[in-house]
């Protein structure tokens, strides 16, 4: 009988390594530990969010900070998107760190519901740091990164994005992590708003749909 199963993940040319629990008889699963390979060996990163977003470029379209929760640990990550006209008959779509099929679905939603004409665009997506995330709550960050690159409008660096438009779990932890790292604005699903509306020190923008979220983040229009 196996008590615990751990996966050791990491890209070959990346200094960060992940230890992910997928089975644990004595605690929760899907917990994540982040380590860095140094001259003394693997060293735990006590605040991985700060390190993983520290090199985020300023005023660059297609880059957005997203909030995710792995197990019970909230983390902020940088989502990067590049959208450019295709040179081929069929547009190329590449996703690193996120589920490829889910990205395809979100692109279809952007075309149908938001009206972005990306059917003839190559789309490249990447989560910085070599981390793979399957949580549905990053969907909103994905579509905003794509829209930002497509419109060539940079996302305000003081804004973080948490959750899909439906309510997400651990909303208090996500907002606390954003506040800890100095973010002053955050976009969340409206269904989560009542729980956190009295939070001090950060401006909370609730959204009902993708179009509204994109207009707020890229255009500053809260209506």
Predicted segment positions?
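Peripheral, non-AAA+ core regions of ATP-driven protein-machinery
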Residues: 1-66, 73-223
């Amino acid at each position: 009988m196996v008590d615990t199963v751990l996966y050791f993940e990491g890209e070959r040319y990346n200094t960060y390594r992940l230890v992910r629990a997928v089975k644990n008889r004595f605690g929760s699963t899907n917990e994540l530990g982040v380590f860095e390979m140094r001259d003394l060996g693997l060293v735990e990163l006590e605040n991985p969010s700060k390190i993983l977003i520290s090199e985020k470029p300023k005023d660059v379209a297609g880059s957005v900070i997203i909030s995710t929760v792995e197990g019970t640990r909230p983390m902020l990550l940088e989502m990067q998107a590049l959208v450019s006209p295709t040179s081929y008959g069929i547009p190329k779509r590449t996703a690193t760190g996120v589920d490829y099929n889910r990205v395809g679905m979100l692109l279809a939603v952007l075309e149908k519901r938001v009206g972005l004409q990306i059917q003839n665009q190559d789309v490249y997506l990447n989560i910085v740091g070599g981390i793979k995330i399957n949580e549905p709550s990053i969907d909103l960050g994905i579509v905003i990164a794509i829209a930002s690159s497509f419109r060539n409008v940079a996302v305000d660096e003081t804004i973080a994005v948490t959750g899909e438009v439906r309510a997400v779990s651990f909303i208090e932890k996500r907002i606390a992590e954003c506040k800890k790292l100095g973010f002053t604005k955050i976009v969340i699903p409206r269904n989560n708003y009542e729980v956190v509306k009295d939070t001090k020190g950060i401006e909370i923008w609730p959204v009902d749909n993708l179009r509204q979220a994109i207009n707020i983040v890229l255009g500053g229009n809260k209506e």
